[in-house]
Amino acid sequence: MKKRIPTLLATMIATALYSQQGLAADLASQCMLGVPSYDRPLVQGDTNDLPVTINADHAKGDYPDDAVFTGSVDIMQGNSRLQADEVQLHQKEAPGQPEPVRTVDALGNVHYDDNQVILKGPKGWANLNTKDTNVWEGDYQMVGRQGRGKADLMKQRGENRYTILDNGSFTSCLPGSDTWSVVGSEIIHDREEQVAEIWNARFKVGPVPIFYSPYLQLPVGDKRRSGFLIPNAKYTTTNYFEFYLPYYWNIAPNMDATITPHYMHRRGNIMWENEFRYLSQAGAGLMELDYLPSDKVYKDEHPNDDSSRRWLFYWNHSGVMDQVWRFNVDYTKVSDPSYFNDFDNKYGSSTDGYATQKFSVGYAVQNFNATVSTKQFQVFSEQNTSSYSAEPQLDVNYYQNDVGPFDTRIYGQAVHFVNTRDDMPEATRVHLEPTINLPLSNNWGSINTEAKLLATHYQQTNLDWYNSRNTTRLAESANRVMPQFKVDGRMVFERDMEMLAPGYTQTLEPRAQYLYVPYRDQSKIYNYDSSLLQSDYSGLFRDRTYGGLDRIASANQVTTGVTSRIYDDAAVERFNISVGQIYYFTESRTGDDNITWENDDKTGSLVWAGDTYWRISDRWGLRGGIQYDTRLDNVATSNSSIEYRRDEDRLVQLNYRYASPEYIQATLPKYYSTAEQYKNGISQVGAVASWPIADRWSIVGAYYYDTNANKQADSMLGVQYSSCCYAIRVGYERKLNGWDNDKQHAVYDNAIGFNIELRGLSSNYGLGTQEMLRSNILPYQNTL
């Protein structure tokens, strides 16, 4: 048994199988032009019983034991063909075998081919019964896929399952190019397992040996196999030189893992990144455990911390059992608040402001469902560590539709709130919400009348510290009962646009809603989970101004809006525009003195919102939205983008995004107090582009400029060269990475990345643009 020791050489070889699976069709077709195809009718099933056909210029022999054929000898059986200048056929009876053993020796210009491989050499041998074949001092070429090489001895075994090379070489480069190759004392290519095993392997770039390994495995197909993946290297101002060496472990058909040693020069250690994926009867999930044993930079910056170990744990699970039980996990936790500032990770970002740890178990049958959950938050702030967790929370829904003309629902919730600080208020909240609806509709409109009762009880504890520092004191026990009444009407009109655009249809969809909720003073209730909701067009018609249940604003308002859509003759939506407003007859209030606009007594048209989408053509698209809130005295949020998209590799997008500081403060008050970079709001204009710039060259770029700070926000540039046997990618990224409180300016991280993949081993010929777009700090979002 030969010892199997994977090394860095394997990482350079195994790249193609696990690289991105986008397909550049033109490059793939170009590469396949240099690969031979099987052009004879394919014979299925067992070919051993098929007759052997021999053509030659001359033949002589001692029938039936021996025969010699000379001059353009051509032997065929099933899918196999052997050609040579001279062939000696031997046939002998084997004890216990019903058929004689037939072998051939071939001399001069030996050519063997089947639907899998072509072998060429000066001398050959074959067993016509088993299809075992030997060719000496020759070369080989795979059929229908890239892969070729040379060997002292080439053997076909196991009904053409195995190709075995003695002192052989392998490359996926097309004939005439030996950019890279692998040479080994023995190479075994297993077509069923789609793998090549190589002993005493030397990896060469051109004629120069670069790496050596006593043993390695090389994937030669798209089948899942354990092995090293694409190695990666980059340089960042945060961690200096970084190198990734991922290893894929195919544990079982329903589970696998990726183990990545991640070396960071500045940190002085290796972070072990372990990703585990599974599929079971209870559902599917993914776990990630990243662990850095020690961090010399963190130790220097935080001398008072007992440990410099850095770690991340992430778990996402979703599953259904017995059609009624539901299990969900969304859990992210890190060792310290600075983790996402120091390390890039797809499971979190410093701009999120917090990480969530949520577990839930649900039960659902017809007309009823219940969920028990726990939810905690880890705030990424060393100044403000206060956060509330729900430990536990019970949500119950009961539905009963078609009760006469009515639909009914009862929603209930019980939750216990706990704070990370010992001196902050805590509470148990019980909420009950019965609802009755009267829905009426026809083919051109609908009206829904709804009435509900909002009944909530609070039992609050640990109030001494808060009450001693605030004029408005919290109550240990508080009840809030609020009826709610709503009427929501919609109509849909449509017309043919034969005069302007034959085959096109335009709709006009007016909508009006009246909402009434009486005022209840909620100043004696602490705000545990409520925040202002975004008021885009669809948000204008919400029942609530705030998310959560701690703040339910009074309402005596009418919301009106209109949407118009245009469909082409294939029923594809080409254009839509929506405009709406909320008109307040009385001020919307909660009694919370911390909500500044409740002191303004503003009524009338306070909130406006609009959204639009225009698919100008199959390649051009425009999308935008704006929300104006007079309570904030300005535009709250807006966004717009225009995009040209020819295909997945050719696109250009211009976009703008805006959020006022007042809006950020109202929606994220705790995060706003510590996120200095957003004190002036967000006003950024950006561009994203991806394009093949020359033959086999592609480029991706993104640039965002902060118009408030008059400086660059984030940028990225990536260039990739793709050929039939390798691809090289170089990328640069500059991104916002926190705020320096001492120097009062933003902190940026600069990163330069580089990687190589070997092509032709799998079906991937992608130009790399989609992967580079997704890896950007501000990921590309499709407008079309």
From Swiss-Prot:
<keyword id="KW-0732">Signal</keyword>
<feature type="signal peptide">
    <location>
        <begin position="1"/>
        <end position="24"/>
    </location>
</feature>
<dbReference type="GO" id="GO:1990351">
    <property type="term" value="C:transporter complex"/>
</dbReference>
<dbReference type="InterPro" id="IPR020889">
    <property type="entry name" value="LipoPS_assembly_LptD"/>
</dbReference>
<dbReference type="GO" id="GO:0015920">
    <property type="term" value="P:lipopolysaccharide transport"/>
</dbReference>
<keyword id="KW-1015">Disulfide bond</keyword>
<comment type="subunit">
    <text>Component of the lipopolysaccharide transport and assembly complex. Interacts with LptE and LptA.</text>
</comment>
<feature type="disulfide bond">
    <location>
        <begin position="31"/>
        <end position="724"/>
    </location>
</feature>
<comment type="similarity">
    <text>Belongs to the LptD family.</text>
</comment>
<keyword id="KW-0472">Membrane</keyword>
<dbReference type="InterPro" id="IPR005653">
    <property type="entry name" value="OstA-like_N"/>
</dbReference>
<dbReference type="InterPro" id="IPR050218">
    <property type="entry name" value="LptD"/>
</dbReference>
<protein>
    <recommendedName>
        <fullName>LPS-assembly protein LptD</fullName>
    </recommendedName>
</protein>
<keyword id="KW-0998">Cell outer membrane</keyword>
<dbReference type="GO" id="GO:0043165">
    <property type="term" value="P:Gram-negative-bacterium-type cell outer membrane assembly"/>
</dbReference>
<dbReference type="Pfam" id="PF04453">
    <property type="entry name" value="LptD"/>
</dbReference>
<dbReference type="Pfam" id="PF03968">
    <property type="entry name" value="LptD_N"/>
</dbReference>
<comment type="function">
    <text>Together with LptE, is involved in the assembly of lipopolysaccharide (LPS) at the surface of the outer membrane.</text>
</comment>
<feature type="disulfide bond">
    <location>
        <begin position="173"/>
        <end position="725"/>
    </location>
</feature>
<dbReference type="GO" id="GO:0009279">
    <property type="term" value="C:cell outer membrane"/>
</dbReference>
<dbReference type="InterPro" id="IPR007543">
    <property type="entry name" value="LptD_C"/>
</dbReference>
